[in-house]
Amino acid sequence: MLNFVVIFTGGTGGHVLPSVSFGNYLIDNGYKCILITDARGKKYTNQFKGKVKIINASHLTGRFFFKIIGLVKLFLGFCQSLLFLLKLRPQIALSFGSYASLPPSFAIKVLKKFIKLNFYIHEQNSIIGKSNKYLIKNANRIFVNFEKDYKLQKKYRKKIHVVGMPTLIKNKITYNSDLLLKNNKKFTFFLYGGSQGSIPILKCF
């Protein structure tokens, strides 16, 4: 099928929500798009307009036993992804990072030996995550959010393209300068954190 894109994502909203936004953009512009994620990431996909495929995935953290369990889940996710992608045969695959993107991305690495497709990475953070680092070698392009030095080897730097962050927010957020001036005698500061850091930061205050 022409114009068929699969997107790999998972874990936290920081990975999933931008992928949902970009996937919806593709669908609105005539592409077929399927999202592959894990059970944890699925809760952020309610606004996605296409099909969502759930696979097994896990972090490799904790004690030895839990790392073994994690490896088993990643292998199962790889097998699920390989069978699913063999059936679909997309032209384009795009990873938005997280541990859940590893199984389908490794499946793409295998499939690229037999079918023609392009594989891309989008990195949302100022430091490239572990999952995306593993995949850089096999990526045709690396899309990033910030214009900065990502400390990559010279042979990979030419793959980088600054595109910014896909977002579900349609309207710009503006501040009320009059409100700030009314309270100019009070010391005011703004706290902002990601999905893993915002609650702990706010609890400190």
What do these predicted regions represent?
Residues L2-N3, Q91, K185-F187:
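Nucleotide donor/acceptor-binding cores
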Residues I7-V20, I199:
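A short, glycine/small-residue-rich beta-strand->loop->alpha-helix junction that serves as a flexible
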